[in-house]
Amino acid sequence: MMSPSTSAPHNQPIQPELDVLLVSTVLLLLGLGLVMVYSASIAIAEAKFGEGSSYYFLARQASYILAGIAVGIGCFRIPLRWWQAYSHYLLGLGILLLLVVLIPGISHEINGSRRWIPLGITSFQPSELMKLIILIFTADYVVRKAAFKDHFFKGFLPILALLTIVSLLLLMEPDLGATVVIAAIVLSIMFMNGMSLKMFFGLICLVPVLLALLIIIEPYRMDRINAIFDPWNDPFDKGYQLTHALIAFGLGEWWGVGLGSSVEKLNYLPEAHTDFMFAVLAEELGFAGVVTVISLFFFLLVRIFKVGRTAARLGDQFGSLVAQGIGVWLGLQAFINMGVNMGLLPTKGLTLPFMSYGGSSIVINSIAIAILLRIDWENRLKRRGLNA
């Protein structure tokens, strides 16, 4: 690696420097997630595929992680300016995929939701990709339209219209969780870019009203809200998943029942290896494990926002917004997943980044980290007076 005080000769390629602490934190989350996916999925794997299939989800998760690392390495080599230049085309691709997933006979339906496109031995979830795409597009949009950031029709309305279209497509799947995350990404980027406080707070006041309407018009969403306040009122139906998640947390106590010793994962807690893996972790590793995971995510967010602030100081507004948008995305999704597992929020169907089972989320999150590392590397080059 090169020291900050030196520059590379013109005929010598510049070797990338990585934020070792950031990369190490992500690898720790991936590693711990892999262990917990295996532990949480043993029972369901053998129930679905027979005895001797306990490694099924472990093998698939490991392959997703390797694929994510491979794709991430490729994306790291792409200059940040490329993502900005092609953000329109990426947006078109994202909207097209959201339309395709709604076509009967093409999409893969699970539990009444059409969120997946079958791809042979696996499937792809377009809403995961859309989180990254709309983040990049919004960052590019607010930079290009900086002169109109306080203008409702020329600056605010177009991005609001886009958010409405994307939200409607997601709600047709339905996927309220992804809708909430994407709305938060867009609003946070616009806020960080300095949009009019009057328009921002006006929209913030409108969001709870829209969320309330979306909850009221769908009885199952209202049931999830009611289950938060008293899951024990109907522990065998509407409160079933939450009561078993809370039991898992209670059994874990301070130090857990031991890795692999969870009772709730034995076909009691639904989605134990995906949306509710955090509850299994709490049962097996206890309060100590919960604090460890929360601390890792907190440290990861600190490093992410540091990259964003550095980019802003170096005059790279697009890179700064992308980096901080990634921080908002991953931080909010982790918060929602943990909150759902603890009974603080209604069930949303959102995975825990880097840890829950799922190929789409692992690969897309890896791409996001690769772009973040690219921003960090370009920051380092700019401090030396070099171009990426």
UniProtKB/Swiss-Prot annotation:
Single annotated GO MF: lipid-linked peptidoglycan transporter activity
Enzyme Commission code: 2.4.99.28
Reaction catalysed by this enzyme: [GlcNAc-(1->4)-Mur2Ac(oyl-L-Ala-gamma-D-Glu-L-Lys-D-Ala-D-Ala)](n)-di-trans,octa-cis-undecaprenyl diphosphate + beta-D-GlcNAc-(1->4)-Mur2Ac(oyl-L-Ala-gamma-D-Glu-L-Lys-D-Ala-D-Ala)-di-trans,octa-cis-undecaprenyl diphosphate = [GlcNAc-(1->4)-Mur2Ac(oyl-L-Ala-gamma-D-Glu-L-Lys-D-Ala-D-Ala)](n+1)-di-trans,octa-cis-undecaprenyl diphosphate + di-trans,octa-cis-undecaprenyl diphosphate + H(+)
Topology versus the membrane: Multi-pass membrane protein
Cytoplasmic side stretches: 1-19, 77-89, 138-151, 306-324, 373-388
Transmembrane feature ranges: 20-40, 56-76, 90-110, 117-137, 152-172, 176-196, 197-217, 285-305, 325-345, 352-372
Compartments where located: Cell inner membrane
Principal location listed in the UniProt entry: membrane
Pfam families: FTSW_RODA_SPOVE
Segments forming a coiled coil: none
Biological pathway: Cell wall biogenesis; peptidoglycan biosynthesis
Domain of life of the organism encoding this protein: Bacteria
InterPro entries: Cell_cycle_FtsW-rel_CS, FtsW, FtsW/RodA
Gene Ontology cellular component terms for the protein in this record: cell division site; plasma membrane
Keyword terms, alphabetized: Cell cycle, Cell division, Cell inner membrane, Cell membrane, Cell shape, Cell wall biogenesis/degradation, Glycosyltransferase, Membrane, Peptidoglycan synthesis, Transferase, Transmembrane, Transmembrane helix
Residues on Periplasmic side: 41-55, 111-116, 173-175, 218-284, 346-351
GO biological process, one term: cell wall organization
Family under the similarity heading: Belongs to the SEDS family. FtsW subfamily.
Stored HAMAP family: PGT_FtsW_proteobact
PANTHER family according to UniProt: CELL CYCLE PROTEIN, PEPTIDOGLYCAN GLYCOSYLTRANSFERASE FTSW-RELATED
Function text: Peptidoglycan polymerase that is essential for cell division.
Name of the protein described by the UniProt record: Probable peptidoglycan glycosyltransferase FtsW
